[in-house]
Structures are given as C-alpha cells and as structure tokens.
Amino acid sequence: MSISVTSHNDVSKLERIGAHSHIKGIGLNDNLEPKESSQGMVGQVKARRAAGVILKMIQEGRIAGRAILMAGPPSTGKTAIAMGMAQSLGSDTPFVTLSASEVYSLEMSKTEALLQALRKSIGVRIKEETEIIEGEVVEVQIDRSITGGNKQGKLTIRSTDMETVYDLGTKMIDSLTKEKVLAGDVISIDKSVGRVTKLGRSFSRARDYDAMGADTRFVQCPQGEIQKRKEVVHTVSLHDIDVINSRTQGFLALFSGDTGEIKPEVREQINTKVSEWREEGKAEIVPGVLFVDEVHMLDIECFSFFNRALEDDLAPIVIMASNRGITRIRGTNYRSPHGIPVDLLDRMLIISTLPYSHEEVKEILKIRCQEEDVDMEPSALDYLSTIGQETSLRYALLLISSSNQVALKRKSATIEESDIRRVYELFLDQKRSVEYLEEYGKNYITENEWSASGAQDNAVAMQED
C-alpha cells in the first residue's frame, strides 16, 4: 500500500523595498512641531518644520505658483522630506516627481516636457449628479431565446419601504451575470452608464448558508426610495484633459503614453472651460506639487520658462532640490548659487538641510533594518553608523543588504560586526575609490592616451594611402 504525500509550496509575495519606502510622513504633530524620530523621518528639525508650514498652506489651498528650493549636501534627506510631504498630502492632491534629466528628449521640446509636468500637478475636482438604483435583489428572471436571440429579463428589487420590478435588456443582463448577482444581494446600479456594483449581502439572508466565504459582507437593506440622486466627485489632472481633447484616439492615448506635443490652442480652450466650471460650481482646482530633483541639471531656457510659468494663475507649487554649491548655470558661462539664476532664486523660499549627526545616522539605519526585515547586533549597528558618518549615509544603507547575505551564508539570522567589516573590505566607498585611482591611476587608460592613440592611427592610415 503506497501513501502519496502532497507537498505545498508557499508562494511568497513580491515586495520591493525602495530607498524611501520607510517614510510615511514628515513627522509633525498638530502644532507643526517636529518629533525627533517619527513616520520614518529623523533629524532635520528646522527643514521639516519649514516643510510642515508649506504643507499646511497647500492643504488649505492658500498658496499656488510658489517655488521652494531644498538645498543641502548629498545624503541629507532632501528627497526624503519631499516624499514625506507627498505621503502627508494623500492621494487626492496631485504630487508629480520629475528628475531634471528627464526633460531632455528627442520627441518633444524641453518646455513642452516641463509644461506637461506642471499640468499633471494641477488637479480638477469635477462634481456631477448621477441617478442610481439601490436596493436588495428579490428575484432575477432571465428568459433566453431558443434561437439564440436577444435575452430579456426582469429584476425585482426592494428597499425597506417599497418594491419595484425593472425590465432588463441584454447589456444589463450581462452586467448582472458578470457580477454574479443573486437573490439577497444588495446592489447599486448607475443608470447613466449601466454599471452594477455589488455592495454585499442582506442581513435577512444571513442564515441561507451554513458556510460563507471570507469576502462575504453583510449590509442593511437600503431605506427610502429605490431611485436616488447621488453626487459623484472625480479628480483628474489638467494634463489628462489635454490628452483626451488633443488626440484623435482620445483617452486611449493616456494608456499608450504617446502624448506628443499638445497645441497651445487646445490648452487655452480647456483653461476657459475649466474657468466656466469653477464659476458654475461644477468643478474646483486642486493645486498640487511638482517636485524637480537635481534641478541644477536644467539649462537657462528651462529656468527662463519657470520664471513665466510660476506667475500663471493655474500653477502648482514647485519644489526643487539641489546639492550643488556655487556652480556654472548649464547653457551659460555664469556661475550662480546652486546652479540656478539669481532672478529665479529671488522668487523662491529656500529650505536648507544639514549633515546628520552620528546618533541620527544610527537611528536611520535602525529604521532601515526594520524596513528590510534584518536583525543587527548593537555593536554592528554602531560600527555601521561610524562608516555612514565617515563616508556617506547612502553607502551605509547599501551595506545592510549585502552584509545580511554574508550573515545568511554562515547560517546566521543576525548581522555581526565581522559581517560589516567583510563587506566594507569588498565594496569601496567614494573616498577609498579615489585613493585607489590616485595610487594605480597610471595603469588606467586616460583621455589623453585615447586622443594620442587616435592621432597615431590617423597618421598611419594617411601614410598607407
């Protein structure tokens, strides 16, 4: 007699951990006082308080068309504060992230790319009234033709006060079949589009079955009228409206991504229409946030465009980040603070970030270990904090996952100081890499050698001719 054993393989959920996935907000209380460590944010008290004031004004809709510059050395949390602001604003307020190098493309001009990013950052909250049918299904009758013709049926639906019978067409029957609507289900039907939504199962049918699925939800039978008018709010960006009205394929261009350049006339017509909706009370503008990282990579034409775009009445809040000091403005020979023209700097509120202390680096590394589900001994954490203080925070963060692999190799679930030392010897940081280049630089091929060898090859080719 043979016994068959069935093995079960657990399918692990794919989870990607990003550089800022541990950040849930900017860590402020109701009085805009920053906590030392909260919502994944550590240190940078002054910068977070300033960001909190900006955040409060954005939420209240008081400011728009302002520019904020976050300036500070590398690895001081500029992008982290911006990501924290995005988390605090929520999904209803548009927050668009743009790297300055994304602007340069062969398919569209620089100003068009910036203008599309600006209009993605402005939301339009459109209100409309729709008529819905809401109630508990008493009976669904479907008559199918023997010859395969159109299906017909009747839907009996009730509330606590009344009961009504509706005639069903082919499309409505297909929608009910797709949602698997049965007698006893509480449903909602949008009359304008014919969309059927199953809200749950009525409490009166709770004893129909002995066993129920985990996703079964019981709700009360709706009260009052079966047909009701309901206000629905949709939030779309101005860019979405631009794309739908500018392309022949309409909304399909949103999914293909091939938006191309949009004519100014189309945008003017949309701005006029949105202004009419605002006056009629049908829509309201939601000024969002455009975050431009590595802003010093933009050239003088882009900065000139921002000078004009920020003065527009439909302009979002633009947050820029730069880690440059006094450097050359791209496209010119002039030097300026942060690589940004002085006339644009004059329009900005500047938030500065400072290097982290040893204790702050240690706290950030501890939060990242929790995020990556890694156990680390206190001595190893101290040593890694020292490395982060002497080299850079990013380098120390990268050593967490690699040292965890070394620990797993020796069958240990906890990272020890020896594991950190091992990966520190294997992977160079920026300072040690420069020292290595200075020591062994003569063995590398340099630009001068390439140019010399190229000239020699040209001379040989000319002699052969």
Curated annotation (Swiss-Prot):
EC number: 3.6.4.12
Pfam families attached to this UniProt entry: TIP49, TIP49_C
Catalytic reaction list: ATP + H2O = ADP + phosphate + H(+)
GO terms for cellular component: cytosol; Ino80 complex; NuA4 histone acetyltransferase complex; nucleus; R2TP complex; Swr1 complex
GO biological process: box C/D snoRNP assembly; chromatin remodeling; DNA repair; regulation of transcription by RNA polymerase II; rRNA processing
Residue spans crossing the bilayer: none
Chain residues that bind ATP: 72-79
Places the protein is found: Nucleus
Keyword Transcription attributed: yes
Molecular function terms, GO-annotated: ATP binding; ATP hydrolysis activity; ATP-dependent chromatin remodeler activity; DNA helicase activity
Entry keyword set: Activator, ATP-binding, Chromatin regulator, DNA damage, DNA repair, Helicase, Hydrolase, Nucleotide-binding, Nucleus, rRNA processing, Transcription, Transcription regulation
Statement: the UniProt record of this protein carries the keyword Transcription: yes
PANTHER family: RUVB-RELATED REPTIN AND PONTIN (PTHR11093)
Purpose: DNA helicase which participates in several chromatin remodeling complexes, including the SWR1 and the INO80 complexes. The SWR1 complex mediates the ATP-dependent exchange of histone H2A for the H2A variant HZT1 leading to transcriptional regulation of selected genes by chromatin remodeling. The INO80 complex remodels chromatin by shifting nucleosomes and is involved in DNA repair. Also involved in pre-rRNA processing.
Family statement drawn from the similarity comment of this UniProt entry: Belongs to the RuvB family.
Quaternary structure and interacting proteins, as annotated: May form heterododecamers with RVB1. Component of the SWR1 chromatin remodeling complex, the INO80 chromatin remodeling complex, and of the R2TP complex. Interacts with dil1.
Protein name: RuvB-like helicase 2
